[in-house]
């Protein structure tokens, strides 16, 4: 996906979400803030949301049509125990791990 495929009014929001997630990394099975924010966004988009899947996982369900076909997307939310280099404005707050 490129910026040209995204509605212009969403680009700033999406950039903000990405930077926020990067600024607040959480290690595997400890992504409580991240999963809560993702669930909140999915609800705002009108999806049915299931939380606590496998611990901190989130599932968003978008119902369309007669339900005979399904599409699934998966994304990792966990950070890695790596020290971040550089100093961008979205630098991870705990510098001992990052996305």
Where are these regions (language model features)?
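A short small-residue
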Residues: 16-20, 88-95
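Acidic-glycine-rich active-site phosphate/pyrophosphate-binding loop
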Residues: 74, 78-92
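Structural motif
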Residues: 69-71
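Conserved small/polar residues in nucleotide/adenosyl-binding loops
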Residues: 98-99
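Divalent metal-coordination and catalytic microenvironments
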Residues: 21, 60, 73
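N-terminal hydrophobic or amphipathic helices/low-complexity stretches enriched
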Residues: 1-23, 81
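A non-catalytic alpha/beta surface segment that caps or lines the substrate-entry region
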Residues: 27-67
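Generic N-terminal helix/loop capping motif
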Residues: 17, 24, 28, 41-45, ...
